[in-house]
Design a protein with these regions (language model features):
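Extended basic (Lys/Arg/His-rich) segments that typically form rRNA-contacting surfaces
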Residues: 1-229
């Protein structure tokens, strides 16, 4: 299942041939470099490691000048990318498995790649189904009303516990809180995958993918777009 690493730019709308207005998420996926290729006899399955973006190697400013934004690449990343023939270290590294069950069911050949190859948005086509993985927006520590959608307590008749969870378990037996009880806690900033999303448009010149609907993550967040099957 080959895919591509991209950056979520935001949402917009497009119009199809019937004149219908379709909300779309725009993902910018500049050409991904193949960093490493792993075979089945090495790790048990065929996979490819892709690199997205760029990191600066060292401080690119002279004495007295402002330091440019962005973190500096670790020497390990620089050396890892150099083995694939890259002079600039990628910002993000992700692995994509190639010999998944869907390829076997459809009796499709496993694609072959070599270090240094480029993966572009042209691997997708309008109308194709994809699944997108991103990191949802972090919302910090939240109560049960926002985190789980609880209704809260009454607003009148002297009640002061408007957003409390209420009872969290019986007292006499079993005299404990059952595992899995929905409670206040950290909300968001979790890996989330949405499946069966439709590619509405491909802009090869600007490396853009227009995907119908919403995609998890904030603006400028990193997302993985994979073929559905």
């Amino acid at each position: 299942m080959i895919g591509i690493i991209g950056r979520k730019l935001g949402m917009t709308q497009v119009f199809n041939e019937e004149g219908q207005q379709i909300p779309c998420t725009v993902v910018e996926a500049t050409p991904n470099s193949v960093i490493k290729v792993l075979k089945k006899d090495q790790v048990g399955f065929d996979s490819v490691e892709l690199g997205f973006g760029e990191q600066r190697h060292s401080r690119e400013s002279k004495k007295g000048e402002r330091t440019p934004r962005g973190r500096r690449a670790h020497k390990a990343i620089v050396g890892h990318a150099a083995k694939a023939g890259l002079t600039v270290a990628p910002e993000v590294l992700r692995s994509f498995r190639l010999d998944d069950a869907q390829l076997k069911e459809n009796k499709k050949e496993i694609p072959s790649y070599a270090p240094g190859d480029k993966i572009t948005v042209e691997i997708f086509a309008p109308g194709e189904q994809v699944k997108v993985t991103g990191t949802s927006k972090g919302r910090g520590f939240q109560g049960v009303v926002k985190r789980h959608g609880f209704g809260g307590g009454p607003n009148t008749h002297g009640n002061t516990k408007h957003r409390r969870p209420g009872s969290i378990g019986p007292g006499t037996d079993p005299s404990r809180v059952i595992k899995g009880k929905r409670m206040p806690g950290h909300y968001g900033a979790a890996r989330h995958t949405q499946t069966h999303l439709r590619v509405e448009r491909i802009d090869v010149a600007r490396n853009l993918i227009y995907i119908r609907g919403s995609v998890a993550g904030p603006t400028n967040g990193i997302v993985l777009v994979k073929k559905q099957g």
